[in-house]
């Protein structure tokens, strides 16, 4: 691989730093690129952008690679954040990381990398890419299934995967930390980032309240009994237990309360008691806005596995239909709190086939 130019997305974290080091050891000409995807609150107690950039510079200096910063904030607000607000306004719970990967990290970033003369890009994602016997590129789970991030990458297409390297896909996370310590990376003990990137560590409701108005309404049980008031449907997600404002049962049971449904027309939030309440369990779902890694949908009747949220175990299912921009899945066992706005992602073993945005569950 000597001399081939690769642009590595460097965030200031351990994973992308080790990625850059590994590729340099393999003989690549490595250029580090730091993406600034959010303009606001640079001086906020919750914003780490400035420190992240300083970490990138320190790592680049240590391992001997050139690094630059590029601002994709305008693209991010237009392609990702606007959709995020639309989805919450409609009562759904989006996953902006999925859209960010497809539109920013593997589109705007990829285009910029190609303008720098790179042949490929690389990121610190835990996933794998391989080319099969037919010449198509496949997206696979990372060998370390506990850290696998293929769920967030399922919208990547053939052109994107053909130009992408995921060096950490073959390495356990524990080994990545060991490498960082062994080579003396200044950020070797830095915590992994969690949550939505533009929200950071700030309270989610506080952030969302800056952009969406609160519209209080009744909180009801399935039989119509009013048990409280919600602050606005956008501020709740299906399966949510904390932050509802209800203690034990009004009828004496100590079971926890969960958000079960949202009725946008009447501005009603329905809550139920007990983790396994029937309203939280659904055997089928419908998804739209589909994207398939190979460019083609699976055949109706095919037995697959699916995730309806990150970190969920693969759930056996059958493809009831995959026509045009509509996917219907029937699960072997009813799934818990299937949430409109989240992604339903299909797998055939370790191979990620793609998926779509959940529209409804029944």
UniProtKB/Swiss-Prot annotation:
This is tRNA-specific 2-thiouridylase MnmA. Disulfide bonds join 100-197. GO terms for biological process: tRNA wobble position uridine thiolation. Residues 147-149, 309-310 are annotated as: Interaction with tRNA. The active site is at 100 (nucleophile), 197 (cysteine persulfide intermediate). It is found in: Cytoplasm. The gene is mnmA. It comes from Cupriavidus pinatubonensis (strain JMP 134 / LMG 1197). It catalyses: S-sulfanyl-L-cysteinyl-[protein] + uridine(34) in tRNA + AH2 + ATP = 2-thiouridine(34) in tRNA + L-cysteinyl-[protein] + A + AMP + diphosphate + H(+). The keyword Cytoplasm applies. ATP binds at residues 9-16, 35, 124. Residues 95-97 are annotated as: Interaction with target base in tRNA. It comes from the Bacteria. Its EC number is 2.8.1.13. GO terms for cellular component: cytoplasm. Keywords: ATP-binding, Cytoplasm, Disulfide bond, Nucleotide-binding, RNA-binding, Transferase, tRNA processing, tRNA-binding. InterPro entries: MnmA-like (IPR004506), MnmA-like_C (IPR046885), MnmA-like_central (IPR046884), MnmA-like_central_sf (IPR023382), Rossmann-like_a/b/a_fold (IPR014729). Pfam families: tRNA_Me_trans, tRNA_Me_trans_C, tRNA_Me_trans_M. Catalyzes the 2-thiolation of uridine at the wobble position (U34) of tRNA, leading to the formation of s(2)U34.
